[in-house]
Amino acid sequence: MWYELTSAKTNESLPRSTRMYSGGNLKNAQFSLLSSRELVNSYFDVNSGGGLDGVLSINRSSFIFCTTEVILGIGVRIR
């Protein structure tokens, strides 16, 4: 099942390349496609440092989308 990441504030879809295949398990979804510095700078206020990668590494072991939505303002829409 494919999941499409959207911006919670504007409800606009992120670029098609950010879609990921999670195997139907949201907790195991990988965000490696979001690690691009250009993509991060396009949608987030990146502080000096690790940026999005630094934030995601905090909860990488027990990662869930609602945690990301609170921190980064990302919503997930199931197609």
Curated annotation (Swiss-Prot):
It comes from the Viruses. This is Protein B6. The lineage of its organism: Viruses, Duplodnaviria, Heunggongvirae, Peploviricota, Herviviricetes. The gene is B6.
